[in-house]
From Swiss-Prot:
This enzyme's EC code(s): 2.5.1.75
Site (Interaction with substrate tRNA): 108, 130
Keywords, comma-separated and alphabetical: ATP-binding, Magnesium, Nucleotide-binding, Transferase, tRNA processing
Species of the source: Serratia proteamaculans (strain 568)
Gene it is expressed from: miaA
Cofactors that this protein relies on: Mg(2+)
Protein name according to UniProt: tRNA dimethylallyltransferase
Annotated positions binding ATP: 17-24
Annotated residues for binding of substrate: 19-24
Annotated region (Interaction with substrate tRNA), positions in chain: 42-45, 166-170, 247-252
Listed GO biological process terms: tRNA modification
Function: Catalyzes the transfer of a dimethylallyl group onto the adenine at position 37 in tRNAs that read codons beginning with uridine, leading to the formation of N6-(dimethylallyl)adenosine (i(6)A).
């Protein structure tokens, strides 16, 4: 249908923010006040059996305010931004058809971007090219391939760490297949989101507050049984650190501890540091985000009222 003044786009709400910023609490409170249904936008919460280390909403919270797109994949399975976009659009359409408003809440900014702007026309994976890249990595090391990427696509090389073989391999694969860099292709936007989106970002006013919350929550997760949860995953035998699930913050560090590579104290230290780095990346995304209303997570009542006021205007 062609959009005209007679066919306005239906509303949707984004609640974005760094880890440990109170996004879930705000979303649940909004569900008490607005006709919304919640959709999770989190690349870790999709995995079953990864509850404590991902700070997944509790059973009580999920009973009070069900979240769609939680527990939809086994940790051994992959899940891409394209998968998320397809799933989210389907859930949003169902919510809208039921006369309610989709409220998308989470911190995976790449998913929000894919949903808003569509997906870039990247070539599909080529097993032969991927095998050639992995063979070179086995012979020369990923550092050599990262230097190669620096020459081909310096912008992507700045974003991709040498210790992230999946993303590094994909960036090289895209160039070898298409002759164009990942940076060039990601500038080409796909289909935009057919909704009128109210976008909100919730965060503490200072970095120190984020750091304090992260450290407190990490220790709370450990006290709640994070190590036991990780040991159960480790014992499966089919999971490893090349999988997106086990590369999630906290699980990667726990894996190193369970493998005997680092001590318990070092695991805790690295886990907290990695979570802080994640929050920093999330804040960097958000500071460059267009058309976003900022909310102070230290004033949840005001944040709730602000969202309701904007959405109801």
């Amino acid at each position: 249908m062609i959009e005209t003044e007679m066919t306005p786009r239906p509303p949707a709400i984004f609640i974005m923010g760094p880890t440990a910023s109170g996004k879930t609490a705000l979303a649940i409170a909004l569900r008490e006040r607005l006709p919304v249904e919640l959709i999770s936008v989190d690349s870790a919460l999709i995995y079953r059996g990864m509850d404590i280390g991902t700070a997944k909403p509790s059973a009580e919270e999920l009973a009070q305010a069900p979240h769609r797109l939680i527990d939809i994949r086994d940790p051994a399975e992959a899940y891409s931004a394209a998968d998320f976009r397809a799933d989210a659009l389907k859930e949003m359409a169902a919510i809208t058809a039921a006369g309610r408003i989709p409220l998308l809440v989470g911190g995976t900014m790449l998913y929000f971007k894919a949903l808003l702007e569509g997906l870039s026309p990247l070539p599909p994976a080529d097993p032969a090219v991927r095998e050639r890249i992995e063979q070179q990595a086995a012979e020369q090391g990923w550092d050599v391939l990262h230097r190669q990427l620096q020459e081909i696509d310096p912008v992507a090389a700045l974003r991709i760490h040498p210790n992230d073989p999946q993303r590094l391999s994909r960036a090289l694969e895209v160039f070898f297949i298409s002759g164009k860099t990942l940076t060039e292709l990601t500038k080409i936007s796909g289909e935009s989101l057919p909704y009128h989106v109210h976008q909100f970002a919730i965060a503490p006013t200072s970095r120190e507050l984020i750091h304090q919350r992260i450290e407190l929550r990490y220790h709370q997760m450990l006290a709640a049984g994070f190590e036991t949860e990780a040991r159960a995953l480790f014992a499966r035998g089919d999971l490893h650190t090349d999988l997106p699930s086990i590369r999630c913050v906290g699980y990667r560090q726990m894996w190193s501890y369970l493998s005997g590579e680092i001590s318990y104290d070092e695991m805790v230290y690295r886990g907290i540091c990695a979570t802080r780095q994640l929050a920093k990346r999330q804040m960097t995304w958000l500071r460059g985000w267009d058309s976003v209303h900022w909310l102070d997570s230290e004033k949840p009542g005001e944040a709730l009222d602000s969202v309701i006021q904007v959405v109801s205007a």
